[in-house]
């Protein structure tokens, strides 16, 4: 699909497309997002293809240690990992369960929601528990919440529509809600 004014055609499969899912995970762990030490692009690709301990969506990162404990194939026994490497990765993941709201929003990789927009939204809503009800109510594009969102300085209809698409009830919304349940 090509959006009006765009020079590129975009795949609309979202997280159902393996290539997009991998790139979204790489963005999620990038330096300006969650910045999880020891979990970069190369490791994301390996875990994505892993049959025993796959990382297919962001929440899988935060359940990795639990799944490893219940797996016959331990991470420490795998090529490229050892006991210390596995422990370091689990510790690095644990440390990232607390994150600034703006970085969390940025990490989601929502189209048109970059660092600056994430900071504007975080400044306006302060925290997730204020943000998500407003987004849910704004799904009705005639609601006061929709108009409030559009009127945030630096946020326009394009950004709001991207946010609403990402947070519509469905697979992506469920993925985000599961992720939030594993964060502090």
Kindly label every feature range from the protein language model:
Residues 1-184:
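Accessory alpha-helical DNA-binding modules that contact the DNA backbone or grooves
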